[in-house]
Amino acid sequence: MAQTENKNFSDWLVVSDIDGTLNTKMRTLPARNLKAIEHFVLDLGGHFTLASGRNVASLEKHFHRLPISNTPAIVLNGAGIFDFKKHEMIHFNAISEKGKEIAKKVLQKFPMLEVEICTQDNILLINAFIYGPALVGADKLPHKHCKSLEEAYPYDWGKVVFFGPPFIVKKVKKYTQSLANSSDVHYMSSSIVTYEMLAKNTHKGTSVMQLAGMLGIEYEHTAAIGDYFNDFDMLKSVFLPAACGQAPKEIHDIAKFHACHCNKGAVADFLEYIEKTY
């Protein structure tokens, strides 16, 4: 990487998805990405952070291996902004009571679905047989099993994840769009076996722009990189969107920069481009 000590990126915010973007498909961090982030933050003064569907406990280990403690992170696909330096949720947008009723209707219509409800500091599991236990078990995440959605009602819900086979998830998507009050929440696809629900006007993009406002960063200096449909809103929201090489066509169609495959260091590609171009 060329040395450009005369450049100052302290008025820039660059945000990256984690799985399939910052990390490889094997969920390892390419040394090239780490080196590029260290250079962008420590040498050039830029703001870099992560935006993920993960909760705080799951994202923490990925956050702390990077030199980015001064910049809060986006958690729960935009439902929260967490300041790891203060260890404090500085913004949390909870799903409304109408949204909870929508989740109830979905589970009544598709009783075979597994449901994960993410609160600020816990994961609530309903009908957890395969997907839920695997998810919380992989990172040993704090969680609680609930016998029904009603048992989870007293909590503030950041996001709801419906788990099921791909053909069932497709039916869930179609059903939710037909419901009255569907405009009171925001839906997104995060994989072929998951469909997520958040509060209205809540996604990675809204939280990234809110974070930029907190940091006093102008729109023209906001950038983000992602690889899948749950990154779509974030990429549409920032000035400079980038797609990893393996991203679907729909993601590449809205990107201004096209990085290499995540296995080869897509984040480094993007940061090098920013340093060279701006």
Q: What residue spans do the PLM features occupy?
A:
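Short active-site oxyanion
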Residues: 44-49, 69-71, 159, 220-221, ...
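Mg2+-dependent phosphoryl-transfer enzymes with acidic/Ser/Thr/Gly-rich catalytic loops
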Residues: 4-13, 30, 196-278
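Active-site phosphate-binding/coordination module
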Residues: 31-132
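Non-catalytic pre-domain segments flanking phosphatase-related domains
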Residues: 1-16, 35, 39
